[in-house]
Amino acid sequence: MSGDGAVKTVQLGKQVNAQAAPAQPGVNVPAIKVDTVGYPEAWPKVVVFNVNPEGAVVKDAGGQVVTTIEASAVVDFGLDEASQDPVWQVDLGTLAAGRYTIEAGDAASDAFEVGPSVYDQALVAAQKHFYFQRTRTALVEPYATWEGDSYLRANASHVHEDVGWDLLDFPAKKRKWTVEGGWHDAGNFDMYIPSTAPTSQALLMAYEANPKLFADNQLNIPESGNGVPDILDETRWGLVWILSLQEDSGVFRANEAVVKWTPEGPADTDKTERWIAGPSSSATAKAAAVLARASTVYRPFDAAFADRCAASAKKAWAWLEANPEHLRASKAPDSDQPLWDDEPEFNDFGARFIAAAETWRAFGDASAQAKLEAALADERCNQKEVLGGAWANLSRWGVAVVATDTKLPKALVDKARGLLRGAADTLRERVESGDGYRCASGPDDYYWAHNSNLLEKAHVLTVAAEVFDEPAYLAAARDQWHWILGRNPNGYSMVTRVGKGPTRIYHMEWGNAEPPPPGYLVGGPNYSNMGFLAPDAPAKALLWDNPAPLRSGVPANAMWHWKQEDLWEGGFVPEGSWTEGWWAVTEPDIIYNANLVLVGASVL
């Protein structure tokens, strides 16, 4: 947004491409920002105003004024750097259960709830997302529904003859793998261990963090009613796919994917050749980690499956011990597929760290303890890595496991706790005094997958709150939850069907659906790639609505951008089309949602 608040026109080459319409308080978003789901009665209820809140009133559902904002309750933050919004903060204090709105002159907030179970449905929606991402199954009623809307897939997807070819023989089709289960990674139908393994692990961690929140018959999935918490049934769908990609040697293959990109769907119409990529030490380490944890979580429910996970994890760990160098998976010539951790700029340090941590935690393996000692002494294990997080570096999880361990040497635990406290203090300071919306992201943190990365920071805070018994860390983590659900510069929830969330999300199988399926967390502000949308305000580098027509005349649909011949021209904006549906800010991913579930379980 320019300094005078005017909407900028984006020009690519000789063609005017789109209009950037960043969030402007009181123009296209509310000037009073709330968590659009609500607040538990016992929590602080901080609201962000972009107008002076003195004299503002809180009204109940009947329009009656229940409280008036006094000057003593107002924190004048000033200009928020990441949004360029003027900000005042107010804690509404005690409110009885009910539905409320806030008014300040002509400005008004969205409605919000106060109550003891205000987030119950949000947590269910975040988990339900995974059912809609399942592959190798039809999606049928009564399961593929949400609040009266159906999202059906007539037949099982990706069970055709061209599934499972070994990429090491490419382009010949010689050897074939038998694969089962799994989730589509994002809007495309490809599947990757580097994302599926930490996704599954985050779901298991969520269950262990707060098991009382997760029950059987909670998610309305086919396995509901079997006596196992539904979150564990859903997670198993990912685990069985991971298990199917292990070689006899113990190493894991990296992914199951097409060479280019999958078509737009529905998923059961995709008959593209699907290849099993080569072996990868990063994939092996991440698989070892999640399977080790699964071996303990599933034992009370299915000892045979727990034993299978344990055997696979131990076999993978033995391979890692015998092969200390980074083995990178390769891809087919001219392939568009990402290599995740095996891209040249990444390494397998974080993956091996969490593998050692989980191997120690599950099995008490002495070799794993030795690797933990080496990892914590490595310069790559530092506060910045714990603080930053990301799917490519799971060091923060390794630190968390060691910091909460009761059997490792005290010096090792203290080292991990020192890193954890340093990261948590940095995040807490940012939340309490560095950002007007109480966001843990710095101005340079608004890049691809911002919302997921923000939740990773929130999880660091929840672990620190537990380890150090520090309520301020938990409060800071809850602030990130509020940011995701609407108390942000863009004024809406980043989760479909949760609070005032996106009404369209193009980049998925149901991209034409209005409303979309529940619980999908969008990527969020992406200043690195989409900074032109809000040149001075990185927190607003996404568009707050999606128009039905596209400038190019191409109908808005799930993956319209993949039809654009000039896809990568113009700095991430396909020429001749609107930018609103662009995947750099709207694409979901299973790891995003796993972080959403994990943080939800950890803050509630």
Language model feature labels by segment:
Residues M1-G3:
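Short beta-strand-plus-loop segments that form exposed binding edges in beta-rich domains
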Residues V16-I32, S109-E147:
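Low-complexity, Pro/Ser/Thr- and charge-rich linker/hinge segments at domain boundaries
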Residues A377-V386:
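Solenoid-like repeat scaffolds
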